[in-house]
């Protein structure tokens, strides 16, 4: 360390702490950020939607707005109806065991020939059902407008495989849970740290390993949709 200090132009014996660089270690006022989130009006929340759509367009991420669960269910059923399986002719869909997903009533909306699975902690065939499904439906607890990100938290009945394995990932997000930026998200996570693993998802899988050509779907979903549902309309 003494050599590094010398190279950086400091005394070899000078031990520098955080107090020497306050701007690097500035702490965020979590309480103030949470107060801002809690005080955001419904109109202000709706104002975040165009920001999300603008950010998503750069990431090949499709954003849909829905007024209520019925409209959201119709949108999702339409996506499934107009999509084809990538590797198999079987049309299977897997959805999280979540009350918001259940409110979509997809079993009554999907056409004949589409098999709908729901994740369950006691289902021994869950792995095979997930692999066989070309669409995975989740209900992330938070979304971020500025980075077009959804936060997927692993919970009982809500495995991360649903968002990672199927070729198409559809995320159902409540408008009330759409945040402005990552600063707000980190404030939420500091207040309510997840008990299990979680991932930030910003669009479909992307890689440019070969000849610097961008390819979607090599290591995960090739297509992603976020359906933002406004429950006040």
Predicted regions located by residue number:
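The feature marks the mature, well-folded catalytic cores of soluble enzymes
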Residues: 1-233
């Amino acid at each position: 360390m003494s050599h590094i200090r010398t190279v950086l132009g400091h005394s070899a014996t000078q031990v520098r702490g955080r107090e020497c660089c306050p701007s690097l270690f500035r702490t965020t006022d979590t309480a103030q950020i949470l107060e801002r989130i809690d005080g955001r009006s419904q109109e202000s929340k709706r104002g975040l939607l165009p920001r999300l759509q603008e950010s998503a367009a750069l990431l090949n991420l499709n954003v849909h707005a829905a007024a209520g669960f019925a409209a959201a269910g119709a949108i999702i059923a339409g996506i499934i109806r107009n999509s084809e399986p990538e590797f198999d002719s079987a049309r299977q869909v897997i959805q999280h065991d979540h009350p918001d997903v259940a409110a979509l009533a997809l079993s009554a909306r999907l056409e004949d020939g589409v098999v709908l699975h729901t994740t369950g902690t006691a289902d021994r065939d869950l792995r095979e059902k997930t692999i066989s499904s070309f669409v995975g439906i989740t209900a992330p607890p938070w979304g971020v407008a500025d980075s077009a990100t959804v936060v997927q938290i692993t919970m009982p009945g809500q495995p991360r495989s649903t968002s990672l394995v199927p070729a198409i990932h559809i995320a159902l997000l409540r408008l009330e849970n759409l945040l402005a930026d990552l600063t707000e998200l980190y404030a939420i996570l500091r207040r309510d740290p997840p008990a299990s693993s979680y991932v930030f998802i910003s669009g479909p899988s992307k890689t440019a390993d070969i000849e610097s050509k961008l390819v979607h779907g090599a290591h995960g979903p090739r297509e992603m949709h976020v359906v933002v549902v406004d429950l006040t309309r």
